């Protein structure tokens, strides 16, 4: 058998599929990141080792701002190419919806690099609007205001507009339009009004119901006519500058996007024919990320189109309908936050220990006085072959069930139960191995690989770092960052360190269907074993919660230059004291309470003075330490 090669690992984990030129494997068998086009790479294993020397413990979130820059450039260049190809005469504006990742360093990097690319920000709530107005200092960039609005929200936006901000208030419900009219009159400002239209078209994938008739936001055709009449009656006809639609996040099929664009383009035409000179068409989000690298519309974690195809269809549809009707090309706004941010963050954590189902030692023989069920099961295992495996499987299941029943009634002892378990799982392993080599294996054996997978216990919280994996079964690319020149001989599911049975990952990307285990290597005592979760830059940080009071992880900003990489910033993860404070425990009061209790215990002779000091020292250091295992 030939030696395992790096190319085998590339195929096994499909890194060339989902890595989109950012992630690959080097000759040392380590995952490397290539954030920019100049080819400078970052070896993740070397980076993690250096961070460990700096006392930065895993789990850690690595952010690569150069990837953010590259994503902005990529999207902008796609629009430029499409504009030239289709004769597009208006402007394109890339808008970043900060709900995707509101972390200040992320937003500031996007604003800083996006200035020359017409990049603006979107706010979907009052707190987000406060952030957006303050950080977006470029008066030429757009601010789009979505979400539900009250008077204070609208007043803040209108006053910011009055001071020079290019702000668009997008009407989600009819009552918002009335509030905008009222506040605009009070403040003596001509508002930039947008209207979100509820299309009949919907997206595809997990967020399909975000669009279409069942969508949460937007005006129906009847409500739109009512809104137009209202604006005309209030002298606001010239204030309608923008129409907006959104058919859902992570749209998997380009055909759904094309259908929505055709429908929305007719609203643009109809409004112009009615004398409403709309200047902007905001086509919303939906531009997907190929999480599994299959480029398949059948997978909820993939998309069957490229950024260029998405942009080509957007521009060509609106150019075509505008030219046919003799109206100006609209300025096109895109809100593609997921596509901008997903690739720039990588979560790294260490495997702490493993658990494997028991198996029978080949050298072990059955004692003459062993229970008859043990002897029967041993005989099945000893004579197992391909011709007998289905019958053997049925017999083994029956014997195990009988043994468990007898144990529950106190008839079979613990030693016998343990022997039954080891023999049963050894039979299961051997049957799975035989079935794996068959072209047409019995259906009963399909789930055996999942059943037999090891458990790898990892130092992270699924709920804090990968909430979409738990909440909506989102599949992220996961693989080791080292030893990729070695064949992974184990199969495992991943378990986090929360005290919750839901804290596990049992679905992984595969070039065929979803896999229920991850190929991994056996642990070595001499070195830590790290796994990485990729494409986690969108939504995960902000949606994460503190289940079991596991807080934010350490975060590291890594940039590249011609000499290599540079660790720009290390942001410490939350301490135990910080997360306790969130749930209204005062750390200082906790320490005082413990000091009183320890003093009392020392006086009563329960512990010595030195033991009391040691306990308090451990408590204080733990209180101001990392919430994860160190």
From Swiss-Prot:
- Look at the named UniProt entry and state the broad enzyme category this protein falls under: lyase
- Which InterPro entries would you find in this protein's record? Ala_racemase/Decarboxylase_C, Arg_decarb_HB, Arg_decarbox_C, Arg_decrbxlase, De-COase2_CS, De-COase2_N, De-COase2_pyr-phos_BS, Orn/DAP/Arg_de-COase
Q: Which reaction does it catalyse?
A: L-arginine + H(+) = agmatine + CO2
Question: For the modification N6-(pyridoxal phosphate)lysine, which residues carry it?
Answer: 99
Q: State whether keyword Flavoprotein applies.
A: no
**Listed EC numbers:** 4.1.1.19
Q: Which UniProt keywords apply?
A: Decarboxylase, Lyase, Magnesium, Metal-binding, Polyamine biosynthesis, Pyridoxal phosphate, Spermidine biosynthesis
Offer one example of a GO biological process linked to this entry: spermidine biosynthetic process
Organism domain of life = Bacteria
**GO molecular function ontology, one term from the record:** arginine decarboxylase activity
Which coenzymes or cofactors are required?
Mg(2+); pyridoxal 5'-phosphate
Is the keyword Lyase assigned to this protein?
yes
Q: Which parts of the sequence bind substrate?
A: 281-291
- Function of this protein? Catalyzes the biosynthesis of agmatine from arginine.
- PANTHER family noted in UniProt: ARGININE DECARBOXYLASE (PTHR43295), BIOSYNTHETIC ARGININE DECARBOXYLASE (PTHR43295:SF9)
Family recorded in the similarity comment: Belongs to the Orn/Lys/Arg decarboxylase class-II family. SpeA subfamily.
> What is the protein name stated in its UniProt record?
Biosynthetic arginine decarboxylase
Write the gene name: speA
